[in-house]
């Protein structure tokens, strides 16, 4: 949830360019930004590869958007070039610098993603809620279900039973927010619990943050392949 202080509002009003995901991901910002000509919503830009949300059993939900788009390396690269293009329009004198920065970011981002083998069969995993779909192509993951469709709502007994009855491996990797408690997943039996932060809070370098998330996720699923 987004809390806006007066200082945030002033910074937004003073900014020459505001990049945000859009109403679907940051609804509290919509009133402030939707009519701001300097604000660009990435989800409405047409530059991203966007996937639908899935239910807790992996079925795509029609007319929905999974907003965790930044986890897909190709999307991250597109965002970098998009920002470079926008800033170049505003400051043509700095165009070469902006595009050089975008190219460097793209090279580093794609190198990080190419470190993982995507040729073998997808490695199954569970999540507390479905937030990692955009990592699956790069890390060769296969979604086998989620405990809940809302991280703030406890899983039902029926869903826990479904996961246990349909588990593809005896030992499963569970990706979850750090605030998830053992009581919420202990009935899943043999699992490797991996706390992850898909929002990358408290990180100041995107490629480094993506690498950290990828390493944790990959290690978790590989531990269940043995």
Show the residue positions of the predicted features:
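Extracytoplasmic metal-acquisition and chelation regions
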Residues: 2-226
């Amino acid at each position: 949830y987004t809390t806006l202080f007066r200082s945030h509002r002033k910074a937004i009003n003073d900014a020459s360019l505001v990049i945000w995901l859009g109403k679907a991901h940051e609804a509290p910002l919509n009133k402030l930004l939707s009519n701001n000509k300097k604000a660009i919503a990435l989800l409405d830009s047409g530059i991203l590869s966007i996937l639908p949300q899935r239910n807790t059993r992996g079925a795509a939900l029609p007319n929905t958007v999974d907003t965790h788009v930044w986890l897909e390396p190709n999307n991250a690269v597109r965002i970098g070039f998009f920002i470079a293009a926008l800033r170049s329009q505003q400051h043509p004198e700095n165009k070469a610098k902006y595009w050089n920065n975008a190219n460097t970011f793209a090279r580093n981002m794609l190198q990080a993603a190419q470190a993982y083998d995507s040729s073998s069969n997808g490695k199954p995993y569970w999540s507390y809620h479905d937030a990692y779909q955009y990592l699956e192509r790069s890390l060769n993951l296969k979604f086998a279900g989620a405990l809940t469709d809302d991280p703030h709502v406890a899983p039902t007994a029926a869903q826990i039973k479904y996961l246990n009855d349909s588990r593809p491996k005896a030992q499963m990797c569970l990706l979850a927010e750090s605030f998830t408690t053992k009581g919420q997943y202990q009935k899943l039996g043999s699992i490797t619990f991996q706390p992850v932060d898909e929002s990358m809070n408290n990180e100041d370098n995107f490629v480094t943050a993506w690498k950290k998330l990828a390493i944790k996720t990959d290690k978790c699923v590989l531990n269940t392949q043995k």
